[in-house]
């Protein structure tokens, strides 16, 4: 881990010498692995959205096009210029995450006020806030030069990183909030926070989760309405502990997800042959349960290929982090990698009953134009760290 908090450029002539001139602005292996995932995502989205009028493949494709353009622009931008804007990132986070509560533009959907509508344009600010959460976490931790042993400073950092989580929970959006926590966790780990502080934080959070789950019915009965947990959140936790619970709701969703994966066999049923989604048995097929559609069509073998691509991508990402010219660059890349790791484990894990059901999407695979654009912005930030390594 780097022991410096400021940029210490390497000789640009030496750096450029090891990069082919045609590709000096693009890390080809890294971007090819991401492109392979995007292509697989478009293939499965074409199938998943074909039979569902609520989703548009064209909109998903437009997200990819916009994302590619932004990725190219961001790759050319020197990420070092962002290192001193901690307060700005925090303010942007708060504004984005509270925007859905504003009258006229705020939109409620599926029990959460998470959307903003500006004329014909509708998007989730919480998705775009992932970018500023990454930059906020990286800029905060970079100030400590790779070592954070002072408890008071550690608590100060926790307080800053908790603000986006608190804001997103006012919507409420637990899934996105968990993603923010994963970003913060990887920033603390990669930034050299004392391991005793980290263990203590995990213990406190675990205790709070148990306390909330146990006390929720008491508070609900006293108040006459949901206080700590929404009904669907409690149901998902109970289904995770007992898959036979709520067989007509979240328990049904899990059962159909596992049927879809199991029915794919080793080589799958084939493209456009995912009957669980096409016949309407699998809920939210293009979004939460897109892995089930993919596994049903391409089988266990296809799932192994998908996981292998994720592993290759993450290995290349961590290599970029290891060779970054400064701690800020390392932290940006590690935060993004941590976010993707959490999303992959949670999304696939919930499909096979190993994790609670949430609305956390699968990187480059799940439906959502905003989601795709944000992932491409993340690719651009990582590529910028590689391009400007020593510049």
What does each model-identified segment do?
Residues 109, 113-115, 200-300, 327:
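Hydrophobic, glycine- and aromatic-enriched re-entrant/interface helices and adjoining loop segments
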Residues 141, 178, 183-197, 275-302, ...:
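Interfacial segments of multi-pass membrane proteins
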Residues 69, 77, 136, 210, ...:
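Transmembrane alpha-helix boundary/anchor motif
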Residues 65-69, 87-88, 94, 154-167, ...:
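Hydrophobic alpha-helical segments of polytopic membrane proteins
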Residues 62-70, 297-314:
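Hydrophobic alpha-helical transmembrane segments
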Residues 319-358:
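Loop-to-helix entry and N-terminal half of a specific, functionally important transmembrane alpha helix
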Residues 2-32, 36-37, 43-171, 348-363, ...:
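Membrane-helix boundary/helix-loop-helix interface segments in multi-pass membrane proteins
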Residues 35-42, 91-101, 181, 207-208, ...:
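Hydrophobic alpha-helical transmembrane segments of multipass integral membrane proteins
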